[in-house]
């Protein structure tokens, strides 16, 4: 008896509420899986509706439309002959569920709702869905009339179920379930499940892929099994970027791994695997003893085999391969826009340089995809790069058509170095660059106060107060935002772009500066989207250093050393951010932790550490209001202060230096200093 089977998983660039577009991508993935000889296909979480519908999941239309799309899949005879695992939202007994639908030859076999919902970080699934808090429970689901007529039955099973096929056994788990301590695959494997499917909507953040791969390896390394992981790719309408990287593992070893970042709308990953490898892996007596004690699952018998019925097909198992990881500096990318292009205000500093380099990196990916014949990308390029009927041959040529940079300086205050760095970078990447002085705008705005009140503000060096000095600086900063949007609206017309259009304004404030509030409200940090708003300065420096060598851009070396000082280092800011968000430490707890990390002989004193901790929290508290209007940032760092839904905090805080936490820090510092004077060690 043959034990070789070909399986398929996929990454789909789905879009929330793009019903027909999502359906077409699902259909394409199934057809590609069939062409590759696969007999099982699994896809991303909620792929029919798109994962990022957010509060639209509270609308009844979403569930009706999802059933409409499911009906189209069931009635498409070209999709027969393969077992299909597809994700959609469903309504059952008045409750909303995030569910999988298992389909074979136009018939809905069962529905498998998600057991454990993601409800931390960026996720709020409990807001939309009900968890299936009945492990191993199965009941009947009433189908809508349209599906009843097609199925010939009124109900189908719904629940935590195992499918028993003619030659193997399989079961599904969904995204977050893999991350739980007692994941469903543990008892499923002990119940004889040999194939696990996992449909995910897992967004990218730096270094997150390493965690995913480790969890999937662990899922099958001890208990054996074949694991199919599917994930969404691209942006589906929110600030999250889904990074694909679908994969297939056998007994903890990767046999197939898709791209982590791809411009493909549909990427199908297939592998041929040997069921006997799983069975041989499970021969240990200790596993058998636990299997006999494991709680039993209901099984649905499916008259279908995944192995090929003919011996004329020559197959060999797909060999194992090592995992493929991107360096953090390689993971920083930009994806999807429906406007006429981009505009970035270049300051000559590393942040706007990083944003520009990310766009240039995107242009390299796009041009390579064009050369590879990617039809979807070619269609997008023809629409966006409208200045020429000819497809771009180089990234610089494409960059010049879609990317606009602008340096907005002051005649006497802007340095020649920053102006030259901006100009050199624009020339290297090929952007359409504008260099101008904004003195007239600055003086016109400054004089409005004098005209209205008779008061003439002065910079501090000319005898003015701190208030005057800050107000005059902010005129420059905020004028740049207005001018950037003005240019973004008018440049396509100035350049006589066919079809006109306007540009997407990109911001350039990094996560560390957002955390401290080291930015001006409504300056150039205010934009349509901020590609680096959740990336640390340390990672940006590494990215620029990497791009300097790997993208042949030595000009970038000049930017690495052009970094401002905020009274604390960026490495310190990164550590503050990590302890605050990931370790859930307040001011006092953070101080105690840093005593061990930064204190000791020859290192920082307790008072120096206390001053740094208090200074950070003081600025974080007084500037928190800036995050309420921060430009939407692509989520990349797990300590992001994104106020939208990732980091929910007040924006009005009582004075930090009068807080109880700071008083406790002071008490501890005094106790430590007294002990050190006595030559004692305080633990």
Located regions from the model:
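ATP/NTP-dependent adenylation/nucleotidyl-transfer catalytic domains that generate, transfer
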Residues: 6, 22, 166, 224-225, ...
């Amino acid at each position: 008896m043959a034990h070789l089977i070909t399986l398929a998983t996929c990454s789909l660039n789905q879009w929330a509420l793009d019903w027909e577009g999502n359906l077409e991508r699902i259909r394409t993935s199934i057809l590609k899986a069939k062409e590759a000889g696969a007999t099982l296909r699994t896809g991303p979480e909620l792929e029919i509706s798109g994962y990022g519908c957010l509060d639209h999941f509270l609308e009844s239309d979403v569930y009706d439309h999802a059933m409409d799309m499911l009906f189209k899949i069931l009635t498409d005879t070209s999709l027969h002959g393969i077992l299909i695992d597809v994700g959609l939202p469903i309504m059952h007994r008045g409750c909303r569920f995030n569910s999988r639908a298992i389909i074979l030859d136009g018939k809905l076999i069962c529905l498998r709702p998600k057991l454990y919902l993601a409800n931390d970080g960026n996720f709020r699934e409990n807001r939309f869905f009900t968890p299936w808090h009945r492990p191993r429970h199965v009941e009947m689901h009433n189908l809508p009339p349209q599906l009843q007529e097609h199925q010939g039955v009124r109900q189908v099973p719904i629940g935590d179920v195992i499918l028993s096929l003619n030659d193997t056994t399989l079961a599904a788990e969904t995204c977050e379930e893999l991350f739980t301590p007692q994941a469903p695959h543990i008892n499923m494997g002990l119940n004889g499940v040999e194939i696990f499917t996992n449909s995910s909507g897992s967004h990218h953040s730096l270094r997150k892929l390493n965690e995913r791969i480790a969890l999937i390896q662990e899922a099958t390394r001890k208990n054996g099994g074949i694991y199919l992981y599917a994930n969404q790719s691209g942006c589906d309408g929110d600030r999250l970027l889904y990074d694909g990287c679908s994969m297939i593992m056998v007994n903890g070893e990767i046999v197939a791994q898709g791209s982590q970042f791809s411009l493909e709308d549909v990427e199908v990953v297939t592998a041929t695997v040997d069921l006997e490898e799983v069975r041989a892996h499970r021969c240990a007596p200790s596993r058998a003893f636990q299997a006999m004690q494991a709680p039993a699952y209901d099984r649905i018998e499916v008259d279908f085999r995944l192995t090929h019925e003919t011996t004329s097909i020559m197959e060999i198992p797909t060999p194992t391969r090592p995992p493929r990881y991107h360096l953090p500096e390689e993971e920083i990318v930009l994806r999807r826009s429906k406007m006429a292009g981009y505009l970035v205000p270049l300051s000559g500093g590393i942040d706007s340089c990083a944003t520009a380099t990310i766009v240039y990196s995107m242009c390299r990916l796009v041009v390579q995809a064009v050369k590879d014949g990617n039809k979807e990308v070619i269609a997008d390029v023809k629409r966006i790069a409208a200045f020429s009927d000819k497809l771009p041959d180089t990234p610089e040529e494409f960059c010049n058509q879609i990317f606009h940079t602008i340096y907005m300086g002051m005649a006497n205050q802007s340095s020649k170095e920053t102006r030259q760095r901006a100009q050199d970078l624009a020339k290297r990447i090929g952007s359409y660059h504008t260099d101008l002085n904004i003195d007239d705008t600055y003086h016109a705005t400054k004089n409005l106060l004098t005209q209205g009140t008779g008061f003439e503000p002065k910079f501090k060096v000319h005898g003015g107060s701190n208030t005057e000095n800050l107000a005059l600086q902010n005129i420059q900063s905020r004028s740049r935002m207005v001018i950037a949007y003005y240019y973004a609206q008018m440049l396509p017309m100035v350049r006589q772009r066919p079809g006109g259009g306007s540009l997407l304004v990109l911001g350039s404030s990094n996560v560390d500066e957002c955390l401290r509030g080291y930015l001006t409200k409504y300056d150039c940090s205010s934009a349509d989207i901020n590609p680096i708003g959740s990336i640390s300065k340390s990672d940006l420096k590494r990215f620029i250093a990497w791009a300097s060598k790997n993208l042949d851009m030595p000009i970038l070396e000049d930017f690495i050393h052009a970094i401002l000082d905020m009274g604390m280092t960026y490495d310190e800011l990164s550590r503050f951010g990590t302890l605050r968000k990931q370790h859930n430490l307040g001011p006092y707890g953070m101080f105690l932790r840093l005593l061990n990390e930064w204190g000791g002989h020859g290192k920082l004193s307790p008072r120096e550490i206390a001053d740094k901790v208090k200074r950070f929290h003081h600025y974080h508290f007084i500037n928190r209001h800036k995050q309420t209007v921060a430009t939407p940032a692509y989520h990349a760092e797990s300590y992001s202060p994104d106020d939208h839904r990732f980091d929910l905090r007040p924006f009005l805080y009582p004075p930090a230096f009068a807080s109880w936490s700071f008083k406790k820090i002071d008490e501890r510092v005094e106790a430590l200093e007294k002990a050190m004077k006595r030559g004692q060690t305080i633990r």
